[in-house]
């Protein structure tokens, strides 16, 4: 995303979202009672007739609800119009702003938290785009690694004849590998991918990598997995070589933190905290080093819980903790939600209070 204008004394940022990940970031930043200004259109009736036409206009709404479906290119923000053209009489009425990549908006807040500004800062730097492909002799899957998690682009079967017919088997295999390479090339161009990670049992992945490199110079990492398809994608994400290559991606960082959390939970439980009460206590004593919070917890309807979570994040940020918001639809997000929506790795052992 790009920051087009910024005046924190007046409480606003004008932002240009550039892709789906930016919309997801805005979904986690904009809160009820914030105000959002954007160009939109609205049905306006003419006189006493029942006919109406859609009129373009710029409106400011006080936010009530937000809706964002992962891997879509639209963020819907619903609220009450507080500023708009007087001649259309829209003030006080509900309206929904549809925010898309390439469409600027202004966000107004009573006060921007340091954590919210950190999220903005992180998403204004260029994000690494990583394509993942896993396959075996039976099936293949291609996915895009994003800040929202794993976006499955395509899954297909090989249709290779059995090995009892060696000639047909080899022809079928070559056709299958070429097809995988062509699909990967198409997605490289479509998403302007920086890194491609290809994995399979044996060394089939190297053959696909050679086909791709003959047609396009691109950074390719090859590795092995025991199976293709979506299961292979999940296995691939746990490989150290892949984690090292894409370590700046938040979902990979989050998985690494969660793995360390589980390890400490069983062996050294005083080095972790989970659930609002325990994490709040750990933040109070400056013990939190890394923190994962589910996006669902940020948007919980209980206003008191939402206030506590916001306070935890702001205090943790001030005390230089690393904070990552994890998407609900990801494996990491579901695990974190099962642990109370928030987990932390600690800087030093901390005994929990008895009444906690």
UniProtKB/Swiss-Prot annotation:
Signal peptide: none annotated. GO terms for molecular function: endonuclease activity; metal ion binding. Its cofactor is a divalent metal cation. InterPro entries: eFR1_2_sf, eRF1_1_Pelota, eRF1_2, eRF1_3, Pelota/DOM34_N, Pelota_arc, Ribosomal_eL30-like_sf, Transl-rel_pelota. The keyword Manganese does not apply. GO terms for biological process: nonfunctional rRNA decay; nuclear-transcribed mRNA catabolic process, no-go decay; nuclear-transcribed mRNA catabolic process, non-stop decay; ribosome disassembly; RNA surveillance. Its EC number is 3.1.-.-. One of its GO terms (cellular component) is cytoplasm. It is an enzyme of class 3 (hydrolase). Keywords: Cytoplasm, Endonuclease, Hydrolase, Metal-binding, Nuclease. It is found in: Cytoplasm. May function in recognizing stalled ribosomes, interact with stem-loop structures in stalled mRNA molecules, and effect endonucleolytic cleavage of the mRNA. May play a role in the release non-functional ribosomes and degradation of damaged mRNAs. Has endoribonuclease activity. Monomer. Belongs to the eukaryotic release factor 1 family. Pelota subfamily. NCBIfam families: pelota. The N-terminal domain has the RNA-binding Sm fold. It harbors the endoribonuclease activity. This is Protein pelota homolog. It comes from Staphylothermus marinus (strain ATCC 43588 / DSM 3639 / JCM 9404 / F1).
